[in-house]
Amino acid sequence: MAAKDVKFAGDAREKMLRGVDILANAVKVTLGPKGRNVVIEKSFGAPRITKDGVSVAKEIELEDKFENLGAQLVREVASKTNDLAGDGTTTATVLAQAIVKEGSKAVAAGMNPMDLKRGIDLAVDAIVKDLAAKAKKVTSNAEIAQVGTISANGDADVGKFLAEAMQKVGNEGVITVEEAKTAETELEVVEGMQFDRGYLSPYFVTNAEKMRVEFEDPYILIHEKKLSNLQELLPVLEAVVQSGKPLVIVAEDVEGEALATLVVNKLRGGLKVAAVKAPGFGDRRKAMLQDIAILTGGQAISEDLGIKLENVNLSMLGRAKKVVIEKENTTIVDGNGEKADIEARVAQIKAQIEETTSDYDREKLQERLAKLAGGVAVIRVGGATEVEVKEKKDRVDDALHATRAAVEEGIVPGGGVALLRAIKVLEGLKVENTDQKTGIDIVRRAIQAPARQIVANAGDDGSVVVGKILENETYTFGYNAQTGEYVDMVASGIIDPAKVVRTALQDAASISALIITTEALVVELPKKAAAAPAMPGGGMDF
């Protein structure tokens, strides 16, 4: 076991505080509409320019191991806030730095760290309740656009794209952000259910120019196993031919004589047909086939349910207004499923999302939910250079998470004003001793830090501005750092999602309280390199 180095009490906290300051000072310059950029060296490729707090935090590793412990803990604040709310990472870092600084002073003055922590927790709980009570529900597209614009550092185009995407695919819809091949940023919306499987044979193509299959009002056969035997398929094919409608087959695979017969019939014009592989794998495939069945009002044909393919009739097949099959994906538009069945399935998937502990499973369940409930929107971010595209993509990602958070828990005045207004709720809190009261005072001072930092980054005096905001009793009165004017924050579109502000404060307080109550630090000593053996003689005799 490697030897360890240990530091105690004030010495330990001082080292940690230095690490916290180094990381927080690098992150906090990005806060607000006039926040600065941070340039990060990459071991290969061009340097990265970003205004995203968590991206800066993740890159910082300090040489001094004790200082690095402090930096790593604050990095954890930024990462946790990013995971839960997707934005507000810089605010969380600024709050953490302020609480640690004030808390360390109080501990150095001889106060009980555990009572300080209790006081901090009391204050945070009171502020969280206040934010929830004051949050205003997001109702209009304009408000969604404003949240997106603020989170993308004042880029109105990003706000507009996000509002448009959410309007088209709904709040449950999936919105993904990709890098564009061109200099323009564009929005593409896929309505209906799309999955990443294309046609099994190019001979199925009906639109040769676009190389895709387009069917209006087709029947959809949903089968769980491979189809290779033609005899099983014949009854269904004959029934579909008589109906005069096209047929789309979704199965694990279609091969051998079954595929050959379908292709020949398609080429001769006797049958409008196309076959695609079922999406997903294993149990997830079963679930996705069931989703398609519910969306189209059909049945997933499975031998587990005792249904044989030769006994299938037209009433068991799904229907849709339109199906488009390309080389690599299939889109089902306007399925004929019963609304009540689709809603029940959506509720079931939502319950699974709540229960799952795996991030991967949650992501896949959310994709399934979006395909049933709304659709999929893709924002392709363009720019003149690769560096610009990456920087813009960071901002769009932040804005996307912020808009989702706003829809979830509502909005509060931005620019750090919601936290400043929460100072009032700390006045009447009951405490058991003066140390707990000091804990509340620590939070009272710390929640002014984000507003002060936004103003400082804009080149003004934070203390003067915060004083003026607090003099005015109006809840939404604040300071527009972009223009340097005092305005009604909500009316001016300077708003934050309540969830982002809440998460930033809770995460910052949680980790900061742990740092304040730390009494010893243990790190591994670097291994000393063994001395090299002496060089042998040259062997030359004189």
From Swiss-Prot:
EC nos: 5.6.1.7
Predominant location: cytoplasm
Catalytic activity: ATP + H2O + a folded polypeptide = ADP + phosphate + an unfolded polypeptide
Keywords: ATP-binding, Chaperone, Cytoplasm, Isomerase, Nucleotide-binding
Chain positions recorded as ATP binding sites: 30-33, 51, 87-91, 415, 496
Family matches, as SUPFAM superfamilies: GroEL apical domain-like, GroEL equatorial domain-like, GroEL-intermediate domain like
Subcellular localization: Cytoplasm
Gene Ontology annotations for the cellular component aspect, listed alphabetically: cytoplasm
InterPro entries reported for this sequence: Chaperonin_Cpn60_CS, Cpn60/GroEL, Cpn60/GroEL/TCP-1, GroEL-like_apical_dom_sf, GROEL-like_equatorial_sf, TCP-1-like_intermed_sf
Entry keyword Nucleotide-binding: yes
Top class in the EC scheme: isomerase
GO BP field: protein refolding
Job description of the protein: Together with its co-chaperonin GroES, plays an essential role in assisting protein folding. The GroEL-GroES system forms a nano-cage that allows encapsulation of the non-native substrate proteins and provides a physical environment optimized to promote and accelerate protein folding.
Quaternary context: Forms a cylinder of 14 subunits composed of two heptameric rings stacked back-to-back. Interacts with the co-chaperonin GroES.
Entry similarity comment: Belongs to the chaperonin (HSP60) family.
Protein name: Chaperonin GroEL 2
Organism field: Azorhizobium caulinodans (strain ATCC 43989 / DSM 5975 / JCM 20966 / LMG 6465 / NBRC 14845 / NCIMB 13405 / ORS 571)
Gene from which this protein is expressed: groEL2
